[in-house]
From Swiss-Prot:
Family: Belongs to the AAA ATPase family.
GO molecular function, a single term: ATP hydrolysis activity
Bias (Basic and acidic residues): 1-10
Swiss-Prot/TrEMBL keywords: ATP-binding, Chaperone, Coiled coil, Nucleotide-binding, Proteasome
UniProt free text on domains: Consists of three main regions, an N-terminal coiled-coil domain that binds to protein Pup and functions as a docking station, an interdomain involved in ARC hexamerization, and a C-terminal ATPase domain of the AAA type.
GO biological process: modification-dependent protein catabolic process; proteasomal protein catabolic process
Function: ATPase which is responsible for recognizing, binding, unfolding and translocation of pupylated proteins into the bacterial 20S proteasome core particle. May be essential for opening the gate of the 20S proteasome via an interaction with its C-terminus, thereby allowing substrate entry and access to the site of proteolysis. Thus, the C-termini of the proteasomal ATPase may function like a 'key in a lock' to induce gate opening and therefore regulate proteolysis.
A Pfam family that the UniProt record links to this protein: Prot_ATP_ID_OB_C
InterPro entries in the record: AAA+_ATPase, AAA_ATPase_domain, ATPase_AAA_core, ATPase_AAA_CS, NA-bd_OB-fold, P-loop_NTPase, Prot_ATP_ID_OB_2nd, Prot_ATP_ID_OB_N
Taxonomic source organism: Streptomyces griseus subsp. griseus (strain JCM 4626 / CBS 651.72 / NBRC 13350 / KCC S-0626 / ISP 5235)
Segments for region (Docks into pockets in the proteasome alpha-ring): 587-588
Protein residues bound to ATP: 276-281
Protein name, UniProt field: Proteasome-associated ATPase
Length: 588
């Protein structure tokens, strides 16, 4: 179109060879005019083209951004499709099974137990065959080959170990229905010591036991560590302690002398007497003293002995045969410890609660089987070497006579209520010169703490043991009609003495907080003694006076009536029948 305009504007060019100069000049002038016009229009066209280029570049940038967004969307869609495909493929896969590893074979395969079958399968290269342990759970693919190692089973049935078989890899266990079964020991159990009576975790499907389960069935009844109590902390029982040392320590420390004299060591000791007089304390001190003696004999820095503290009432079980089984487990454990040459003390506290006279039961006859079980353990076919049975009771008359005969509980030691001299010894254990003593009391003894403490003890013991009107406690009537007045000293005990000292210490603390005067005074002890008596004025709290008297340590003629003679805050009490007493005392 532009070329056509140019041809019009230019006109017709003269023919070649034309001799008309005017025509040529006119043509050239037109050509020059056209060129001048084009030259004038050139910047405008250039500007238009530049604007067009900018517009195109802008459009190109927008299209590129849109293209990038589309590409990102496509990539995300592709990733989602791939993930969905993997999810579909995963959900479409057959379920993976589990099995229990039994053993590895030389050809690179292994034996497993799964689905009630024992199989020999291949192992994935990603699993180290040497790292698999007996009893370990493994994951299987659809071909039942091992593809991953798992943990050991953590759930199952509880069984009781009876014994380890000779190969050391199997065990005889007893289930909850007393059914015996031979099981395999998983590898974790091969590295530890397990003993008869331990509760084990059993996978009944594979027949493996995996771990020892802490079970309070026997553990809560047995305290194996030796108590940190020695004879020096026991006051007023020197003669009884000497008897126990002769019965317990001599046979173990000098077995050659006993053998030379053909003397059999005692199998058991019975500590009997009223409550709160130190029976349990002595039994604890026996184990500690024996451990120290063993250290002296063997030359070891720390001697070793075991103290099995059997809590009688907790040993009882409502199921038939369970109590007897617990007793067997206790003595089985004692034999295991004693087989190492270590002395073992089996202590039955409140012995009458377990081993009552056979036939004395009212609602049951459980003692008819419990007592023979203990007798069989003490002197049955299996002897007790290095095992000493100690029983404590405040109703020894209720214990079956077969247990108390010689050859079983040979040594019988009565723990009496403390007299005045024994009470001084007991007070000296709790009222020591190292306590904060009041300056006034110290000044009376020229500042000597030992003399002041001794004088305090002397004063409070005289207050407790004086047969005065204020110390009268009970009037008892015997079956023959005789009457007797009993004083508080007749019911004194080491536990009561400790309580009196503790009361006095609390009074001293309160006096310091209220008055600013620090130190224990003899007045605190005397007041504590009075408060202790007042608190226990309702101590006889049973409707059977004779039973109460037997528990309290009063033996002899049967008591048919008890009348209290305590001087109360309102003056002298005329006495009252025991049937009307409602409060509960501490020491029964």
């Amino acid at each position: 179109m532009a070329a056509h305009d140019d041809d019009i504007n230019r006109g017709t060019r003269p023919a070649r060879g034309s001799e008309d100069p005017a025509g040529q000049v006119a043509y050239l002038e037109q050509e020059i005019a056209v060129l001048r016009r084009k030259l004038a229009d050139s910047p405008r066209h250039t500007r238009i083209l530049e604007e067009r280029i900018v517009e195109l570049q802008t459009n190109l940038a927008g299209v590129s951004a849109q293209n990038e967004r589309l590409a990102n969307t496509l990539r995300e869609a592709r990733d989602q499709i791939v993930a969905l495909k993997e999810e579909v493929d995963r959900l479409a896969q057959p379920p993976a099974g589990f099995g229990v590893f039994l053993q590895a074979n030389e050809d690179g395969t292994c034996d497993i137990f799964t689905g009630g079958r024992k199989l020999r399968v291949n192992v994935s290269p990603s699993v180290e065959l040497d790292d698999l342990r007996r009893g370990q759970e493994v994951m299987l693919n659809e071909a039942l080959n091992v593809v991953e190692a798992m943990q050991f089973e953590r759930a199952g049935d509880i069984v009781t170990l009876k014994e380890i078989l000779e190969d050391g890899e199997r065990a005889l266990v007893v289930g909850h229905t007393d059914e015996e079964r031979v099981v395999r020991l998983a590898e974790p159990l091969l590295d530890i010591t397990i003993r008869s009576g331990d509760a084990l975790l059993l996978d009944s499907r594979s027949g493996y036991v995996y771990e020892v389960v802490p079970k309070s069935e026997v553990e809560e009844l047995v305290l194996e560590e030796v108590p940190d109590i020695d004879y020096d902390k026991i006051g007023g029982l020197g003669d009884q302690i000497e008897l126990i040392r002769d019965a317990v320590e001599l046979p173990y420390l000098h077995p050659d002398l006993f053998k030379e004299h053909e003397l059999r060591p005692p199998k058991g000791i019975l500590l009997y007497g009223p409550p709160g007089c130190g029976k349990t304390l002595i039994a604890k001190a026996v184990a500690n003293s024996l451990a120290k003696k063993v250290a002296e004999v063997t030359g070891q820095p720390a001697g070793k002995s075991y103290f099995l503290n059997i809590k009688g009432p907790e040993l009882l079980n409502k199921y038939v045969g369970e109590t007897e089984r617990h007793i067997r487990l206790v003595f089985q454990r004692a034999r295991e410890k004693a087989s190492e040459g270590t002395p073992v003390i089996v202590f039955f506290d409140e012995m009458e609660s377990l081993f009552r006279t056979r036939g004395s039961g009212v609602s049951s006859d459980v003692e008819n089987t419990i007592v023979p079980q203990l007798l069989a353990e003490i002197d049955g076919v299996e002897g007790l070497e290095n095992v000493i049975v100690i029983g404590a009771s405040n109703r020894e008359d209720m214990i079956d006579p077969a247990i108390l005969r010689p050859g079983r509980l040979d040594v019988k030691i009565k723990i009496e209520r403390p007299d005045a001299e024994a009470a001084k010894d007991i007070f000296a254990k709790y009222l020591t010169p190292g306590l904060p003593l009041h300056a006034d009391d110290l000044s009376e003894h020229t500042g000597s703490r030992e003399a002041a403490a001794h004088a305090m003890i002397q004063s409070v013991v005289e207050r407790m043991y004086t047969e005065s009107e204020e110390n009268r406690f009970l009037e008892v009537t015997y079956a023959n009609g005789d009457k007797e007045v009993l004083y508080f000293k007749d019911f004194n005990s080491g536990a009561m003495i400790q309580n009196i000292v503790d009361r006095a210490k609390k009074m001293a603390i309160k006096a310091f907080l209220e008055q600013g005067q620090k130190g224990l005074r003899v007045a605190h002890l005397l007041q504590a003694c009075v408060d202790e008596f007042k608190e226990n004025e309702d101590l006889p709290n049973t409707t059977n006076p004779d039973d109460w008297a037997r528990i309290s340590g009063k033996k002899g003629e049967r008591i048919v009536f008890i009348r209290t003679l305590v001087t109360g805050k309102q003056g002298a009490d005329t006495g009252r029948s025991i049937d009307t007493v409602a409060n509960t005392g501490q020491y029964l």
